[in-house]
Amino acid sequence: MSDTNNHSKNIIHRILTEQINLTSNELDTKSTKEIVNIFSEADKEPQKAVERVIPELINAIDEITARLKSKGRLFYIGAGTSGRLGVLDASECPPTFCSNPDLVQGIIAGGIPSLTRSSEHLEDVSEIAIADLKDRNFSYRDVLIGITASGRTPYVIAALNYSKSISALSISISSVPESDSTLDNDIDIRLITGPEILAGSTRLKAGTATKMALNIISTSVMIKLGKVYGNRMIDLSVSNDKLLDRAIGILFDIGSVDKDTAVRLLKKTNGSVKLSLLIALSGMDVIDAKQLLNDSKGNLRTALISFKDN
């Protein structure tokens, strides 16, 4: 009896992301084909996890959009893989949507060096998170998305606590149930993908689900901010030949202009696809088109409706 009790006391409780995945047991004995098949099957879980949190994603997108329309900014914060995913998503916003680099920012424990070299020990230093936010003048107007697969990263927990304390919008993304971790937030996104193929390696299923969620959040917010027309990136930054070709294609498809006209419009508008489209579709000159876009808060569809109504 006493031996049994002692054994029970010594049982380790593992949070979900640290538990053993029975389908990948004895992984080192599998053939290459078997390993790939195990991964292929496991990678169906991230999609299911995202589908389960659609209501939370909708809420997050609408709340973030409202904050950004009121001069707020969006910050991702995390350590290790979670931090890298946030930095990756934030860094893609300026070239994709021509957004100000300050509008969406990614913060990783340890800063830029941690993007290429592991600094996992820094995830336990709570004070650094608050300092990182203060260095960026993080305020009540802003939004913080704290990313922590385990739901237990001190760096992220401290950031969320600070965010809540100053009434900023606080959103958490984790891959464990509330029974494993309770986080201080306004919106709680739980991407439950189960135990990893490699126990504890949350760069796998948890990381994939997180990347999917961040794609949805940032892209949807930018759509709401008028950065997209139809399904085209009309606020893209024309900075290389590939993007110039894309811009010309957008003007051809939506503005119904030939290549030479598209190039002339882009030169006239300093590479602004959105402004070029408004000119092509309305016949307005640059000054009037620019004024109408400003009056329409940068939304091309709103500007076109206003032009037609007048």
Swiss-Prot record:
GO biological process, one term: peptidoglycan turnover
Organism of this sequence: Prochlorococcus marinus (strain NATL1A)
EC numbers, comma separated: 4.2.1.126
CDD domains assigned to the protein according to its UniProt record, in alphabetical order: SIS_Etherase
Assembly mode: Homodimer.
Top EC group: lyase
Name used for this protein in its record: N-acetylmuramic acid 6-phosphate etherase
A GO term for molecular function: carbon-oxygen lyase activity
The SIS domain, residue ranges: 64-227
Keywords: Carbohydrate metabolism, Lyase
Function comment: Specifically catalyzes the cleavage of the D-lactyl ether substituent of MurNAc 6-phosphate, producing GlcNAc 6-phosphate and D-lactate.
Superkingdom of source: Bacteria
More info: A lyase-type mechanism (elimination/hydration) is suggested for the cleavage of the lactyl ether bond of MurNAc 6-phosphate, with the formation of an alpha,beta-unsaturated aldehyde intermediate with (E)-stereochemistry, followed by the syn addition of water to give product.
Keyword Lyase: yes
PROSITE patterns: GCKR, SIS
SUPFAM superfamilies: SIS domain
Listed pathway(s): Amino-sugar metabolism; N-acetylmuramate degradation
InterPro entries membership: Etherase_MurQ (IPR005488), Glucokinase_regulatory_CS (IPR005486), MURQ/GCKR (IPR040190), SIS_dom (IPR001347), SIS_dom_sf (IPR046348)
Active site: 92, 123
Family: Belongs to the GCKR-like family. MurNAc-6-P etherase subfamily.
Chemical reaction(s) catalysed: N-acetyl-D-muramate 6-phosphate + H2O = N-acetyl-D-glucosamine 6-phosphate + (R)-lactate
